[in-house]
Regions:
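The canonical Cys-X-X-Cys-His
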Residues: 94-98
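Auxiliary Fe-S-binding modules of radical SAM enzymes
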Residues: 1-36, 230-298
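A short alpha->loop->secondary-structure connector
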Residues: 102-114, 156
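N-terminal [4Fe-4S]-dependent radical SAM core
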Residues: 1-87, 100-104
């Protein structure tokens, strides 16, 4: 097996050198210290010879034309089609992950094939009548360099760009990527540090800071919470989230509450009852939030 460098994998941005050919990744709040020959937590940023390289750059594993509402975005280019792109890897470890076949695993550079250039993806989106390109399926933060080049190419072609993200990103990376994004749907996993720590292996505050940064850059944003019965379904937690939105964003922001179905490593909660989602929606509307959407109801 050749090294990532020998196979031409792209040098990653957001890195700094450490003694002994170690590197520190500055892409997400984990700021992984990565020894030579190893990958970071996400599995796709690998240290080869003291240089961090992105295995995900140029290697989409999911390409699909979707209705924009599937992201979900309900108030951005309604009725249009978006060209969805996903790679692999994630910087959170959600036990209830609904897309674990792409987000979690070990990735062999020998299995990745030839690099797919941003220009080819954008041209394919145009050929298929898409109005936007969406970075989705797995966490786009882990392929930020690829997403950034695709986004710039998309804008030159007159397309909009969409990000579907957990928001677990450093401020410096967000300040680089977010200006090139026209619309985003961000996950709000559960409005407590305990929820993020115990069920996602992350933390809440960096996510909230990412939301603030995106808002400052003026893109359209919608937010989605996957409701796990017994974990993040209380009206108290919902109110804490709504209070933050009202204070730091705007009551008019579209908020999505979606149904959980047991998946990956978490089966402690039953599927979300539709009645529970309706209760949350009615509560939010009574509080003066007009744009409340429900999803993933089977």
């Amino acid at each position: 097996m050749g090294t990532a460098a020998e196979q031409g994998f792209r040098k990653a941005e957001f890195q700094s050198s450490l003694p002994g050919k170690a590197v520190r990744c500055g892409l997400c709040p984990r700021r992984c210290t990565i020894a030579e020959g190893k990958a970071g937590y996400c599995g796709v940023r690998r240290n080869e010879g003291g240089i961090l390289r992105s295995l995900a750059y140029g290697h989409p594993v999911a390409l699909q034309i979707d209705p924009i509402e599937k992201k979900p975005l309900c108030q951005f280019l309604p009725g249009s089609r978006t060209y969805s792109i996903g790679t692999f890897g994630c910087n959170l470890g959600c036990l209830f992950c609904q897309n674990s076949e792409l987000s979690r695993g070990e990735y062999d550079p020998d299995d990745l094939g030839e690099e797919v250039r941003p220009e080819w993806l954008v041209a394919d989106a145009v050929r298929n009548g898409c109005e936007s390109i969406a970075f989705t399926y797995n966490e786009p933060t882990v392929f930020a360099e690829y997403a950034l080049e695709i986004a710039r190419c998309a804008h030159r072609a007159g397309l909009k760009t969409v990000l579907v993200s957990n928001g677990f990103i450093t401020p410096e990376a967000a300040e680089t990527l977010y200006p090139e994004i026209d619309a985003a749907n961000f996950d709000m996993k559960g409005f407590s540090e305990r929820f993020y720590k115990e069920l996602c292996g992350g933390s809440l505050e960096p996510v909230l800071e990412a939301f603030r940064i995106f808002r400052r850059h003026g893109g359209h944003a919608e937010y989605t919470t996957l409701i796990l019965p017994g974990k993040n379904d209380s009206l108290e937690m919902t109110d804490a989230w709504l209070d933050w939105v009202e204070t730091c964003l705007d009551r008019e922001v579209p908020l999505h509450f979606t149904a959980y179905h047991p998946a990956y490593r978490y089966h402690a909660s039953p599927p979300t009852p539709p009645a529970l989602l309706r209760t949350i929606r009615e509560h939010a509307i009574r509080r003066g939030f007009p744009n409340i959407y429900l999803g993933n109801i089977r």
